Amino acid sequence: MKLVESRNSGEKEFLQAVLEVSEVIIPFIQDNKKYQTHNILERLVEPERTIIFRVPWQDDSGNIQVNRGYRVEFNSAIGPYKGGLRFHPSVNLSILKFLGFEQVFKNSLTSLPLGGGKGGSDFDPKGKSESEVMRFCQSFITELYRHIGANTDVPAGDIGVGAREIGFMFGQYKRITNEFSGVLTGKGINWGGSLIRPEATGYGNIYFAQSMLNLAGETFDGKTIVISGSGNVAQYSCEKAIELGAKVVSFSDSSGCIYDPDGINEEKLEYIKELKNIKRGRIKEYAKKFSCKFSEGNPWQLKCDIALPCATQNELNLNDAKALVSNGCIAVSEGANMPCTSDAINHFQSSNVLYAQVKASNAGGVATSGLEMSQNSLRMNWTREEVDKRLKDIMLNIHSSCVEFGRAGKSVDYVKGANIAGFVKVADAMIDQGIVLSLIHI
């Protein structure tokens, strides 16, 4: 770790992700000499390529603005780089390296031929007109296009990048290259997208949690759930949980948290979708419309059976974990990327709370992106039912892999299981493909 820290000084998010993985992987490597011989861990924590570029664009007043763009192409041992683009003021190299590193393991768990990467910009779409967002997206992809391709690197959406932004970037890519290909996923259904893609991460989160609960002799039926966030992952985690008989009582955004003790039903969820996806409003407007409680902060002090953190990294700390456990929470399934701090994770595990780590529980989105890539290659569209079944099968297989590598007596360490299962496939591929040992000059 000292070498990693010296090479990545000040990159706290990335170092946190590497440390959490290393704590699980190092003992496994010590028991498997081939990974030591090939120095796999040191190779794995170094991105294959990091691209940083400026993104100039013109605002509606005619002024030239400049943002910074990134693409971290982390590992391509098992397939083309795959991972989202995030547009948010908090974006920096550390965050994207952490996300790209996590993506390597997550993509490996899906069993699809997908490498890992991540990208984005410190551009903030909030408060920008549609024309400004379009001009930024076009400028961003005008540089990025030379580094991506259907068999090289296939970006998707993330925070701040939805179907609108993917459309603007895909259109510009097509103009530049004169090519219609599956270079981006999250596309509109009429121009190469896949059904279930918007729902996939949320649905996948619930499918994984359902498998975890079933193994422990529990179900979603009748359970009270608290959810943080109010974007796609939160919305569709809620939708699938309601379908399985659970009662969801909270949503949140950066302004605060709503608590609806009567439960968020299908009608209320449709209101949230319109509020957040179309009107781009604040969640406190829900509290006004449905006369329920709104407060600043997060929902982790609320009494619940299951917690689904679906907002952002490190949103749930040790004190939050203690509150959840004392309030009777039996399971936590991560929808966001690294939403729980290390202390919180340790507390859940020591308290025998079922804890699903993001590498496994959040893999539904990239799995369905992989299915979109397959449909693009085949020049065909699968039905909603076909995609949903394939997604569910993938999540059940991920759960089985986590159980295989994480079983400890009668219990399952899902952190250990997810990390080792994801590691083995990538590490073995890296060994099989060799390294350049010498250069021959003619």
Question: For each predicted feature, which ranges?
Answer:
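Adenosine-phosphate binding glycine-rich loop
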Residues: M1-L19, M212, V325-S438
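Structured beta-strand/loop patches that form or line metal/cofactor-binding pockets in enzymes
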Residues: Y35-N63
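Rossmann-like adenosine-cofactor binding region
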Residues: G256-Y355, A360
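Glycine/serine-rich phosphate-binding loop and adjoining beta1-alpha1 elements at the start
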Residues: H88, N107-F220
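Conserved small/polar residues in nucleotide/adenosyl-binding loops
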Residues: A307, I440-I442
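Glycine-rich phosphate/diphosphate-binding loop of Rossmann-like nucleotide-binding domains
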Residues: G188, G193-K303
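General beta-strand structural signal in soluble alpha/beta enzymes
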Residues: F98, T152-A156, F180-L184, I227, ...
